[in-house]
């Protein structure tokens, strides 16, 4: 082997070793106790190198280190790069930390980036009920009705967990409440699936009431019969049967139609400008 080739190989190995140490330092796995992120980058660590499935920027978001996220971006980390799971750093940040989300968005992160399952960061923020991340993403242009591989929206993801705070914010931004996924489920039916497992709390009940107000009318029955899992809970079955049997009133159906006609915008601001009495504005905003 020529000396020049040996030097090149040694240089590559050294750079790889530094990059691996960078990942470990960010994740607080102290193989080298005196390592710090800035010194490793100054020494030649590649801020865009992938180790296994991990990239430094994604790792910093996983541990909610906004200062480290900003440092990596300042040093050239690719803000929309994909890791081994085809996820961007924003997908991880959206689950955990508003500060990381804000930094990434400031540096040009795509709020509508898709992972391998076509999930957006907003799907994950809604699922984890990280309400401030939900709001930050929506304010930065995230699609409120983005569809994953199963045609589920962020509202569906929030509803299946009974995440009241996230559901409320998504509805404020005009989320479509009557969306149907590929197997016939709606946001409200996803929430019912949680309630029938006996996992509902007062917050989940409030979430159901909010979705019911937003949808105006819903139907869970097939050929007039409730699903078996609902029928196993007599009290819940009776409540849902009454709601499904009652036709939507003109008032509730008009509320749904008006909200939808306002389009994809922040509805509290849009409704505020309508020439309507205060009581009707509150009604449109699902406050009663």
UniProtKB/Swiss-Prot annotation:
* Effect upon mutating residue 17 to A: Almost complete lost of phosphorylation by TBK1
Q: Which SUPFAM superfamilies match?
A: Ankyrin repeat, SOCS box-like
Tissue-by-tissue expression: Highest level of expression in skeletal muscle. Also expressed in heart, brain, placenta, liver, kidney and pancreas.
A Pfam family recorded for this sequence: Ank_2
What superkingdom heads the lineage?
Eukaryota
What are the subcellular locations of this protein? Cytoplasm
Keyword Electron transport on entry = no
Q: Which CDD domains match?
A: SOCS_ASB8 (cd03727)
- Phosphoserine PTM positions: 17
Single biological process term from Gene Ontology:
intracellular signal transduction
Which GO CC terms are listed, alphabetically?
cytosol
Q: How is it modified after translation?
A: Phosphorylated by TBK1.
Q: Where are the ANK repeats?
A: 52-81, 85-113, 117-146, 150-179
Q: Do you know which SMART domains this protein is assigned to?
A: ANK, SOCS_box
- UniProt pathway: Protein modification; protein ubiquitination
Taking every annotated instance into account, which residue ranges of this chain make up the domain SOCS box? 235-288
Record keyword Plastid present: no
Keywords carried by this UniProt record: ANK repeat, Cytoplasm, Phosphoprotein, Repeat, Ubl conjugation pathway
Principal subcellular localization: cytoplasm
Kindly state the subunit structure of this protein: Interacts with TBK1; this interaction promotes TBK1 proteasomal degradation.
Function per UniProt = May be a substrate-recognition component of a SCF-like ECS (Elongin-Cullin-SOCS-box protein) E3 ubiquitin-protein ligase complex which mediates the ubiquitination and subsequent proteasomal degradation of target proteins. Inhibits IFN-beta production through the IRF3 signaling pathway by targeting TBK1 via 'Lys-48'-linked ubiquitination, leading to its proteasomal degradation.
By sequence similarity, the record places it as follows: Belongs to the ankyrin SOCS box (ASB) family.
Query: What the record says about its domains?
Result: The SOCS box domain mediates the interaction with the Elongin BC complex, an adapter module in different E3 ubiquitin-protein ligase complexes.
Its protein name is Ankyrin repeat and SOCS box protein 8
Q: What organism is listed for this UniProt entry?
A: Homo sapiens
The gene for this chain is ASB8
